[in-house]
Amino acid sequence: MPLAQVIERHRPESERWPGIIVEVCEDQIVRELGRVRGIAQQLHGNGIQIAIDDFGAGYSSFSTLRGLPFVELKLDSSFVKECAVDATNAAICQTAIDLAHRFNSAAVAKGIESAADLQALTVMGCDFGQGDLIAPAMPQERFLELLRHRASASKPAA
């Protein structure tokens, strides 16, 4: 069964449902642009949004970006790494962040491993980040434990 039909059949009816963001790799978009556009339109009708993953590592063009209703542009980690000290990587990151914002989308930096890179990306206006510096990959049980710990730490004492 196609993903759009699965979501339509099983999604909550609540107006408070936050939806889902599906990541599509840039290479996949380029190879099957027509198909991805059709699926993106079906998903959008069910509260599902698209994030373009690994942006900059593939062969996308402005016409590719123009034709997709994406909400996140995820910068490939190869550009994020050492963007605080590498002028070329910094220029690419800044350009991608600006591009995301011009499309009214969020810029997400992948592979943040140093505090210097995090600071540089923050100054550039990057909206979100992910990587080992922020939180390493972890099993579901550890993630749920981390959420519980953060939730209990944020509650005021009675």
Language-model features: where?
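EAL-family c-di-GMP phosphodiesterase catalytic domain
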Residues: 1, 19-34, 46-158
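A short, hydrophobic coiled-coil helix within the histidine kinase transmitter core
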Residues: 6-10
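Short helix-capping segments at alpha-helix termini
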Residues: 12-17, 43-46
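Conserved functional hotspot residues or short segments at active or partner-binding sites
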Residues: 39
